[in-house]
Amino acid sequence: MIAFAEDTSGISVSFEFFPPKPEAQDSFWATIAKLETVNPSFVSVTYGAGGTTRDRTLDTVRRIVTETSLSPAAHLTCVGASRAEVNAVVQDFAAAGVRHIVALRGDPPGGVGTRFTPHPDGYRNAADLVRGIKELGDFDVSVSAYPERHPESVSIEEDLAFMADKAEHGASRAISQFFFHNPFFLRLRDRIAARGIDIELVPGILPITSFSRVSEFAAKCGAHVPPALATRFAGLDNEPETRNLVAAMVAAEQVDALRREGVKHFHFYTLNRADLVYAICRVLGLGAEKKAA
């Protein structure tokens, strides 16, 4: 039997969602209601490439503000947009009651691995975007982090230099890309501390709903998938109940191991599904109070 740590005091979580299409509205808000019982620190809503989901992102965070007890964080990218266009989105978020923005440069139009060229009148990079957001108001700003190096960086040192710039311009939190080998994250945490970068590093946790899809995405992002993980999911493509049990256990083990290393906050990539994430949070001792009330 796996022995999880008994002391889960001080643990907090947050969740990422993407804005639902019209036909998925009912299931999306049911997911929100389910995970609201866990009392997350915040919930973030993604912003499609090139601003393609701008209106849906805005509508979603507005409803979260007005219809739930949750604190929303709106994602924002600067790819393919002028400063004026990006600033207008920030002002729209503020008018909707959003005080937390996840500032991301965004992927180049050609996708991961292609060359990024800033808009001639736009923000140059994520650090520049952070500075612009902070100039527009007293926002809490989160940014991204890459335990295994950004696909476009030549080294971890270059990543750390970018991280230092983002922190210097006002970012308070760095949410990591998903990873499956904890030492990558812990080494990044140590390097950030050694450089004296004043920013909270939060692990991004991705429960595996489909191992094949996660493997494909990991390959594009440069995220390592341990062979032992492949073994645990082998042959489960057509056994969803068993696959979900394994997925919940794998993610709970990862979170528990990080908690034993002093990590207190966990950010879950939900893929707009409540089942696995809710189960993991209950393993962590979260949500019981509201459920019993």
For each feature predicted by the language model, list its residue ranges.
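N-terminal amphipathic alpha-helix/helix-capping segment at the start of soluble metabolic enzymes
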Residues: M1-F18, P22-Q25, R131, A288-A293
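Active-site-adjacent beta->alpha loops and helix N-cap segments on the catalytic face
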Residues: I2-F4, A24-D26, G51-I64, S82-A88, ...
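Active-site pocket-lining/capping segments in soluble small-molecule metabolic enzymes
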Residues: A3, P120-Y146, E158, G196-A248, ...
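Short, well-ordered coil/turn segments that N-cap beta-strands
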Residues: D7-S12, N39-F42, T68-P72, G97-H100, ...
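Active-site mouth loops of central-metabolism enzymes
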Residues: S12-F28, P72-A84, D140-E158, A234-M249
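Conserved, mostly hydrophobic/aromatic
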Residues: E16, V43, F93, K166, ...
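Active-site beta-loop-alpha junctions enriched in small/polar residues
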Residues: F17-P20, T46-G50, H75-A81, L104-D107, ...
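Catalytic domains of carbohydrate-active enzymes, especially glycoside hydrolases
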Residues: I32-T46, E168
